[in-house]
Amino acid sequence: MSSLSGKVQTVLGLVEPGTLGRTLTHEHLTMTFDCCYYPPPPSHEAISKEPIIMKNLFWIQKNPYSHKENLQLNQETEAIKEELLDFKAKGGGALVENTTTGLSRDVRTLKWLAEETGVHIIAGAGFYVDATHSSETRAKSVEQLTDVLVNEILCGADGTSIKCGVIGEIGCSWPLTDSERKVLQATAHAQTQLGCPVIIHPGRNQSAPFQIIRVLQEAGGDISKTVMSHIDRTILDKKELLEFAQFGCYLEYDLFGTELFHYQFNPDIDMPNDNKRIKRVRLLVDEGYEDRILMAHDIHTKNRLTKYGGHGYSHILTNIVPKMLLRGITEGALDKILIENPKQWLTFK
């Protein structure tokens, strides 16, 4: 049995699972997203280079990945500290920071934010999508990648003694690449060794989550300790959603606050709004999956911070929870989704 068994590992050390409270399971507090810059059309180049100001906020909201400054969340540490203090004041207790290698992970800043705010912060080990993999990462064997993941949890990440408490978000593209497949296999092997929680970023295709689960299963992963992120932009069909739910992984609706007319990364998808997300969560609760649901905002760009007129990290607690109660989701179910399910997932076996 691991020395981590029965505990949750935050950037400040091990804590008892019962101390977490309401938990957002998929957020970012410091990262860069240059890897996913989406060049604007020539007619929009000028506005894409302007500072973030009131008159261009609507354009940035519709084209968040075409504005380079908007992709530098790591420049907003003080603003994010204030947002975390507000999150705590609104009843929040913990947050899983999903920034991995490839997105400028900075565990030192995460530790500082945890110390300054009193919010439990759990850091993520591992690698983002193939486009961010270095030649060194691509050259590693599954066994070597496993060692990297285990080391980031047992010893520390980014050359520090600050330890990660989950593996992920592990980035997957569609179709899955050879390098991503190796990382998934290594993730399953590390999970077997450590009994740790895992969280996956699936490719933008409804078949991607199914393929990923199969790879993890074949490599010996524990699906019951695994989160499939971004369900709200990936599995839109009700029948397919209920079919996927039978695998037993956690189903994460983590784009609350994102209401896009045009989804730049996949124009074929009509991104659901928060009302539709609430309906999907209600469906899953009614179908008996309330112990498999997680929620978050996946804030990863500046425009989603309250400093820039965005919804911020307190949106779910302030706006979504009351609306869910109006739509017939009980307080008991919400406590499961926001407190009990994250606690169970984040606790090492």
Curated annotation (Swiss-Prot):
Gene3D superfamilies: Metal-dependent hydrolases (3.20.20.140). Binds 2 divalent metal cations per subunit. GO terms for biological process: catabolic process; epithelial cell differentiation; regulation of appetite; taurine metabolic process. It is an enzyme of class 3 (hydrolase). Its cofactor is a divalent metal cation. A divalent metal cation 2 binds at E169, H201, H230. This is N-acetyltaurine hydrolase. It is found in: Cytoplasm, Cytosol. It comes from Bos taurus. Keywords: Cytoplasm, Hydrolase, Metal-binding. GO terms for molecular function: N-acetyltaurine hydrolase activity; zinc ion binding.
